[in-house]
Structure formats: structure tokens, C-alpha cells
Amino acid sequence: MTDLPPEPLRPAVILVDDDPAVAHAVQFSFDLEGLNVRSFRDAESLLASGALPKKGCLVLDYHLPGLDGLELLDRLRANDVRMPAVLITTNPRPHLRARAAAAGVPSIETPLLTDALLTAVRSALAHIEQ
């Protein structure tokens, strides 16, 4: 029997979205693309998990119960989490787009255009793999 080299780890995507249908659709789509998705329903459950990978990408819904997606990102950055992030939201107003841009985060409008979200996540992951 030949020893096979270990399978490379799939890139990690941390998804925080309180809508189960969105979370399921993103998880299914990204799984088909070879991405490893961990889903959380709100900011507090992600923060309590303490299980962030060293490398990966955050996909944060803006409209979360409790902390919104950008407040969650601020909290993570304050705790020295430097993973790239993508913000997803419905009907983003100009002030929200400005806040996301100031945080260095692309925003993708939902209903999700899966290709746009996948492109943004792949771009973020490519930057950390260099």
C-alpha cells in the first residue's frame, strides 16, 4: 500500500448569517467549489466559539441580531483577527457602503448573486495565500 500525501486543507470560510436559507445556500454552493464553510447564526455565537482558523475569509451579514456585521468585524479586529472579510446585505444604503469601504470590506448585495460572493471570497483568500 502506498502512502498518499495528506490532502490539502480546503480554504476556510466563516459565515455569519441569521437567515438559515441564505446560510444553507452559501454553504451548499461553496462546498461544491471546494471551500470549507463554518456557519454561525449571530455574532455572539462566533465570538463564543473561539474557533477561528488562522487563514480564511469572513462572510458577515450586516443585519444580525445583536452586533451588526461591521460591529462584529470591529470586535474581531480589536481581538487581533486579521482575516479578510466580505459584507453581505440587502439594499445597502450609501452610508453603509461607505462604512464597509472604510473598513476595507467589499459589500455584496443580497439576494445573493452567488458568483459575485464567490469571486469576492476567492479574491480575499488569494491575498492571504500569497
Task: Describe each region flagged by the PLM.
Residues 20-38:
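Two-component/phosphorelay signaling modules centered on CheY-like receiver
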Residues 39-57:
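Acidic, metal-coordinating helix/loop segments flanking the phosphotransfer/catalytic sites
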